[in-house]
Amino acid sequence: MSKKLHIKTWGCQMNEYDSSKMADLLDDYQGYTLTEDASEADVLLLNTCSIREKAQEKVFHQLGRWKSLKDKNPNLIIGVGGCVASQEGKAIKDRAQCVDIIFGPQTLHRLPEMIEQIQRGEKAVIDISFPEIEKFDRLPEPRADGPTAFVSIMEGCSKYCSFCVVPYTRGEEVSRPLDDVILEVAQLAAQGVREVNLLGQNVNAYRGATHDDEICTFAELLRLVASIDGIDRLRFTTSHPIEFTQDIIDVYEDTPELVSFLHLPVQSGSDRILTQMKRGHMAIEYKSIIRRLRKARPDIQISSDFIIGFPGESKDDFADTMKLIEDVAFDHSFSFIYSARPGTPAADLPDDVSDEEKKQRLAILQDRITQQAMRYSRQMLGTVQRILVEGPSVKNPMELRGRTENSRVVNFEAAHTHIGSFVDVKIVDVYTNSLRGEFVRGENEMDLRRSLRPAEILAKHKQDDALGVTHFKP
């Protein structure tokens, strides 16, 4: 009888990525298969997030539900990971005796050993250390699950924004070596992945070591990943404005695989609030980045994060945020009402914006973003869009579902043999959360790159120095 594993994941794409790696790891090392039913699992793992309000209480509420399962099955192993685990550590075990394992984002690779320790009779295992890049060295080879995939290129953040727990829960910025990233992408491409999303808390801070002891920048990494056979679409998440440098913007000019969509969090349009947040930039500097991006890629669309009701946010501050939203014409946003995160500098500030005012401002902001997004969607009406077919439509399995460059879901009728490939569709209808398309052509009728020899990649970026010596740089 096979052993069963149930993982519940909250939070960001990095947590989703980590959970998929936990599943692969425990399958490879100990033969655990995933189940959606917690009641039939031998191991329950909760991958937590510190970003949302009352994150800790949410964790203990879930553990209370799982305790009843452990009461029925004393051999059940319960583990808590992620950012709340890193933040709370032993306090989780003190409050929830049913928990056997507490691990941080940087120690998930040690899960097989932790589980074995519990099975040998140890009462609790806690490891929330920061062993830097060791995590990636211990993970199994990547497994494709459809035509899109996330690839983590770095961990942590060193920006220390006043509201954010990430530097304390995931550690400071550590980049994966270049060869490791390229190998993982190539392995996924060989399994049929066509779109890769490079992942990290602050990807544009990437500085990966190369085999010859040089450093690869994020801009160089983007070009290298885009040159891998089979990868025809490239995304990345998430960036910080203060390191969104010109060399990254230049990639948008010469790398068509990089999509015309960017998520670049700004958090506020008020310079005063940005200073309080310790963001390291002003609103005008953010707008300068967007202006240069649109010069390089005129059709690029921008999404952002916004925190509403940060301590001291006045009506004028909120008006500045709304002005920035109008000036930049954001296509999408993740917007949240501020709530203090324990241990952050902002937690010491008076939370002086009323809940009612926060809710009103959030509604106003989200309404404006929705209007702007619908305007962009209507502009797509009648156009032909290239989409990557991800699978059957959620609402109608007889139809297909794909995604445009600007992350809009398109439902359309076509043969299911197109799943995993690119198709062109004509947009014929617009809805709030999706588009309707008509099939135009399949991939066999497109002029997509099929094969590119290494010599051709190198020749594209050949440089000769003053002595006539040729160097190849990405």
UniProtKB/Swiss-Prot annotation:
Keyword ATP-binding included in the entry's annotation: no
E.C. no: 2.8.4.3
Enzyme class at the top of the EC tree: transferase
Cofactor: [4Fe-4S] cluster
Main location: cytoplasm
Domain MTTase N-terminal: 3-120
Residues the entry annotates as binding [4Fe-4S] cluster 2: 157, 161, 164
Disulfide bonds: none
Molecular function as annotated in GO: 4 iron, 4 sulfur cluster binding; metal ion binding; N6-isopentenyladenosine methylthiotransferase activity
Every Radical SAM core domain range: 143-375
Chain ranges of the TRAM domain: 378-441
Cofactor detail note: Binds 2 [4Fe-4S] clusters. One cluster is coordinated with 3 cysteines and an exchangeable S-adenosyl-L-methionine.
Keywords assigned: 4Fe-4S, Cytoplasm, Iron, Iron-sulfur, Metal-binding, S-adenosyl-L-methionine, Transferase, tRNA processing
Catalysed reaction equations from the record: N(6)-dimethylallyladenosine(37) in tRNA + (sulfur carrier)-SH + AH2 + 2 S-adenosyl-L-methionine = 2-methylsulfanyl-N(6)-dimethylallyladenosine(37) in tRNA + (sulfur carrier)-H + 5'-deoxyadenosine + L-methionine + A + S-adenosyl-L-homocysteine + 2 H(+)
Signal peptide: none
Superkingdom, natural source: Bacteria
InterPro entries hit by this protein: Elp3/MiaA/NifB-like_rSAM (IPR006638), Methylthiotransferase (IPR005839), Methylthiotransferase_CS (IPR020612), Methylthiotransferase_N (IPR013848), Methylthiotransferase_N_sf (IPR038135), MiaB_methiolase (IPR006463), rSAM (IPR007197), rSAM_horseshoe (IPR023404)
One term under GO cellular component: cytosol
Residues annotated as binding [4Fe-4S] cluster 1: 12, 49, 83
A Pfam family of this chain: Radical_SAM
Assembly information from the UniProt record: Monomer.
Record family assignment: Belongs to the methylthiotransferase family. MiaB subfamily.
NCBIfam families the record matches: miaB-methiolase, MiaB/RimO family radical SAM methylthiotransferase
Its biological purpose: Catalyzes the methylthiolation of N6-(dimethylallyl)adenosine (i(6)A), leading to the formation of 2-methylthio-N6-(dimethylallyl)adenosine (ms(2)i(6)A) at position 37 in tRNAs that read codons beginning with uridine.
Protein's recorded name: tRNA-2-methylthio-N(6)-dimethylallyladenosine synthase
